[in-house]
A protein has these predicted regions:
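Hydrophobic ligand-binding cavity/cleft-lining segments
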Residues: 1-38, 43-44
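Aromatic-glycine hotspot motif
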Residues: 2-16, 67, 101-111
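Short, solvent-exposed aromatic-acidic interface loops
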Residues: 79-84, 112-119
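Soluble or luminal CAZymes and related metallo-dependent hydrolases
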Residues: 58, 92, 131-135
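A conserved amphipathic terminal alpha-helix motif
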Residues: 115-150
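Short aromatic-glycine motifs in intrinsically disordered, low-complexity regions
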Residues: 49-57
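Hydrophobic pocket/interface hotspot
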Residues: 19-20, 29, 48-50, 66, ...
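Hydrophobic-ligand binding "helix-grip"
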Residues: 38-39, 59-106
Length: 150
């Protein structure tokens, strides 16, 4: 299996700082990431949890670690589903990259995800994320709505 990458880009009619806040503020992430809020101190090496209330109890749906952060232009973190039937080892974590740039009040957000080829069930996980070519687009559309709403 060669290098598998899912990458999507969207233009958002909002300043880069607003888009950045949408990506890292737990009150904002709940609006576009299936009700999940982020829990992190956003420092390299720190844990990052995506948690939500499910059937009356707090549950972590995705966990990982912050790899790199350069507000408001770059965020890199790892992800794994702690509820999946796979060992919680570094090779099974995927990488997610947010890259932002702004020109004339319009922010370009590019999200890419890789690491599938070394991970357990990598090809299946790639196909799940790739989603017949949609990739991150459904989530990016929701991020755009939240950021543009102010």
């Amino acid at each position: 299996m060669g290098k598998l990458v899912v990458e999507n880009t969207i233009s958002i009619h909002a300043p880069i700082d607003k888009v950045w806040d949408t990506l890292v503020n737990p009150e904002e992430t709940k609006k576009y990431m299936f009700g999940c809020e982020t829990v992190s101190d956003w420092k390299p090496g720190s844990p990052l949890l995506w948690r939500a209330n499910y059937q009356g109890k707090e549950m972590v749906f995705v966990k990982g670690n912050v790899i790199a952060i350069q507000p408001p232009v770059l965020l890199t973190y790892t992800v794994i589903d702690p509820n999946a039937n796979m060992p919680d080892i570094p090779d099974n974590y995927l990488n997610v990259y947010y890259r932002l740039s702004e020109q004339d009040g319009i922010t370009t957000l590019t999200v890419s995800q890789d690491g599938f080829e070394k991970a357990a069930d990598g090809e299946k996980r790639y196909n799940d994320v790739y989603n017949k070519g949609e990739g991150w687009n459904p989530i990016l559309v929701e991020i755009k709505k939240v950021a543009e709403a102010g």
